[in-house]
Every structure is written in structure tokens, then in C-alpha cells.
Amino acid sequence: MSPILVRPVREQLEHDRVIRLLQAKFRRRFDVGINPGSEQNSAVASGGSTLYPDVVLLSQDRGRKEMAIIEVETVESVNGLEALAEWVPFGRLKSAFHLYVPAQMLDVARRMCTDSNIPVAEIHTYHWIGDEMRFLPAYKAPSDSRAPATRPAAAKPASPKPKPKAKPARKKPAAKPPKKTGRSPKRK
């Protein structure tokens, strides 16, 4: 449940509509679990507690591994209280945490993620063009951000390997002259 106790009705409808559009978008590649409004359909275990993100993407193979957690925010729900109450626990999970925010709130969301050290894998924006919702990727974390840093770098060998000799380039056949047509050349 969101720390915003009562979200305005119009924003709640927009929030739930974005969740359903994301479900349709990811339906072919993942098993999608959604939690619109106050519903608690798809849970994610985090230590001893259970979390209910807006969208849970599960792999379609036998293991049904969690691939990503998606949290959708509206203009009023992008705030510090929301970031600490929901984004921080989602960022601590093993699966990738994706954040969807309105286009005008992108800078605020990025600043909150950096200030609170929330490891978000991707931030996307959404906006309406006519009667169609557009989702645009705005930020993608470096690929090694979730990889453990305990691996030592591989030692370089003492002697460098000799490079193979480059083969000479093959000659291309000469270009054929253009065909003559019955037309006169174009004037410039």
C-alpha cells in the first residue's frame, strides 16, 4: 500500500491504467502479475516481509524466476516519503527494479534515487500522445551495478600472444560501364 493514504481519484485511475498497459506490453515475453489499486495479487518476498509492487515480471520457463519489479508513480506520488517507503525495499531485491514516472517528474525521481542511494535498474517516463500512451526509456543503470564486486581482476599473461598476420585484401572486379539508354543525359 502506498504511503499516500488517499490518492486523488483521477490519478488513481491513471495509475491503474498505466499498470494495465504495462501488463499488455510485457504479456508475450513474461508472465505478468499486477497489483492495481489496493489489490494484492502478486507478492514478492523480501527477507521476512511481503511486498506488493505494481507489476511483477516472471520468466515463462519452469522456474518462474522474478525478472523485474515495476513501480508506477503519478505526479503526486513522486515524493520522498514514497521513495523511502517503497523504492528502497524494491531496490534491495535481487531482481531488477524499474520505475515508471510521468515525463515531467523524471528529474525529481532521478534526484531522489541518487540522494537515497536506491539502486534502480531503469527509469522510464510515460505521457499521452492523443489517446495513446507512450513509454520512453530515460535512464538505464550500468550493467555491472548489480553484479558482485568481489571477483578479482584476471592477471595478464607475462608474454603477449603474437597477432596473426592480416590477409591481403582481395581486389574487386572493375565496375561495369553504365548501360546506354535511348534518353539524353539530364541537364544540370
Range-by-range predicted roles:
Residues 1-69, 76, 138:
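Active-site metal-binding core of divalent-cation-utilizing nuclease and nuclease-like domains
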Residues 15, 33-35, 71-73, 86, ...:
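Residue-level signal for functionally critical sites in structured catalytic/ligand-binding pockets
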Residues 33, 37, 41, 94, ...:
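Residue-level detector of solvent-exposed, low-hydrophobicity positions
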Residues 65-67, 74-123:
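Catalytic cores of nucleic-acid endonucleases
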Residues 147-188:
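Polybasic, lysine-enriched low-complexity intrinsically disordered terminal tails
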